[in-house]
């Protein structure tokens, strides 16, 4: 209803101003600004909804602000371009419509009415309401009744007798199991669900609506609210360090806790969370690649579900035979938005909906088949009688190709339990939420029936039952939950450990590299990883007077304040203000001590603008002083005009990438020497090894042969035509996820370049 009211007010404002208000520059600017705000808010809502499926929520702040790189960003380029073009067109059209009767005399009453209607349209819009609620949740002091509802359970389970298998199905919400809405979509896993305790009304709350948040909620009984934004949890050394979570209780009770997934464990800090709370045995894409039968059988996120669940079954067999008490958690990935992936062993590879194939539904049908096969193996084993199997979604599906059909249904998360010791078949329609999952499992295992804000759905009363406004209540508790991190509020001295690549201050530890915004009563960490924006781009968003401490590789800050370190890959520390003074210090000891030194200086806006502009230079446009092309730092020597076909810098150098160009092309600003030696330090990937690799300068071509290890080769060139471009053509680029960014399409690697140097020959 509010959407219709908001749009009606917007339309009325446009029509009244366009036809009645007349000419007045101030009223035109004010009305256009407010109407433009309405458009921006609604486009923001649309864009956020595209990513999250739930509008502007905490997942937008946590996952999208600084982490599109790890979200399969290529899938969203076209929608992003469409939004920008649409916004430009709408603003242009608005301005044209409002000025249609600009030659008519100004009418104060109609101008005021149009402006008030425009303000009303903004106030009534769902986007404004959602943003207002988010802002309030960031600034509240908390709710006095939090302590009454947050309960810490006993740290142990007396006399535990059951092993636990807990399966997180990526985005595998219960809605998919509605056979009337989606016939024969989930027959195998749906049949198993109907054999156990099926909790049919598991609500999704703020702070539980993306993978790591769903894991925290289900194991600790609290939403994931943190004193920082972005994927900073990937950078911290501990995760809710004061809280008692399910993994802690299991470990204290004699369980060995295992976690197996196909993606990289570092994504969003899952490794940090699990290690902080009782899990000593973690297996992700890096750990599995030396174990699985086919390490090259991967999707954009990691290993396919059939591979992961096969490894989980092997681990279940091994642990069961050992006789030790254990928990085995696993997380699937094939149903990840926006399209999902199909394991090659599935019988169900295709699902049609509305008369055409649907990739997301197909991925769901395939993944549930794999999960069901895993469960059936456990059920058929002699160890099932000592096992509790839990299947849950980590969160509701985000905007995938099935999302519009899901939204027509009553959506709930999946949570069901199959007990080997005590078969129970029942559908429980009690109102509950993800935070109740851990408490319910704890209750079944013989522990307490509460965990944080979670309550057992078998013997307790969920917060979703107690509070009709549970979403608003959860946001009201946000400051109380943030305080559970015990996060430092000041930074005066710090220590950098080069062996561990860590920085420590005020009792907290963070992985490097790291950017920190430091104010009087708050220290905000902003990390960099494969899944977040580069720190220099994050620093470019700082205000002129914001105090910062930036710890990174020296070459990344050298172009601004330390050109002598332009080729150094050592650690450096920069601190200051973008509009004031900055210092750069080289970290020259294994354990390096530093102090913050922020001076209250006069802000120079010209200096600020220059710093911001330099920080925003993209990697390929950076230039440094050197007599050779060094590939393990960003940019190129000053003599290079442009280059293509080359991937991002890595610690050793860069790969050629045929996804970016079939050949490596380096164009220099001036013609290459008439006679020169080309000294190439490089290696080959896969089948490119031991094969002739053409290297061309103008009309002359030489042959380069490389192995799988780095070697240096010198080629002799004559350049009578004054050519200015060097071309290297890898013979057989290989499509691979080796060293790839999680969630990105495979690269096509040919040769790995460490250094290329042009040496002029006399004569």
From Swiss-Prot:
Its EC number is 2.7.8.20. This is Phosphoglycerol transferase I. CDD domains: LTA_synthase (cd16015). It is a multi-pass membrane protein. It is found in: Cell inner membrane. Pathway: Glycan metabolism; osmoregulated periplasmic glucan (OPG) biosynthesis. GO terms for biological process: glucan biosynthetic process. GO terms for cellular component: plasma membrane. The chain crosses the membrane at residues 1-21, 26-46, 77-97, 108-128. The gene is mdoB. Belongs to the OpgB family. It comes from the Bacteria.
